[in-house]
């Protein structure tokens, strides 16, 4: 569904990602892992058209996206939940959802909003509340909901669990699994390696902007040395399966 071919991208003369190739199949939950500064967020921003592609190509549903405006990617069905959520904190929950659905006819707003509220009932209870007054977990729910308002086929999620309490992490990961079961294709960037491996079908690991591993999550769990070398962690999921 999404394919990167020898992608290199960066910021002016600085190259953040080097010669990266991978493909995300329709309906999959694909995890992109790596230490801070590995190029994960730059990859997501290149897919969305917010970072310069210096070499290589990006395809979505066999259509080349390289060089096309960010709005085109939204219209084609790609949405992003950015790191740090980036909500309009002075607007209400409802108003943030309206912003998320700006590319669709207003007539579809109510149906899309109910779909979001079904996934996150807590947002329905707080739909008139100012986004900046929500808890961190509720704000992450709203960030996901805002992305879903455009009825995407493909969802990019950058650092789902960052700064969240364990209970909220559980709720947000369960929401991703629900979306996957409903047919949404997901690319997840996540620092919580064990949780990412538990839900992902396939995993890529980046280090210094380069691909160092690609395989199924099951295979990755068997490679403890991989996580110690590139992520500096002992992965509980790996340890428990050995």
Which stretches of residues belong to each language-model region?
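The feature captures the beta-strand-to-loop junction immediately N-terminal to the Walker
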Residues: 33-35
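ABC ATPase C-loop
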Residues: 147-148
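ABC ATPase NBD coupling module
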Residues: 52, 64-85, 89, 109-113, ...
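Conserved ABC ATPase signature
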Residues: 130-134, 138
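Helix-to-loop junction immediately C-terminal to a conserved catalytic motif
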Residues: 48
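ABC-type ATPase nucleotide-binding domains, specifically the catalytic core motifs of the NBD
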Residues: 12, 52, 68, 93-111, ...
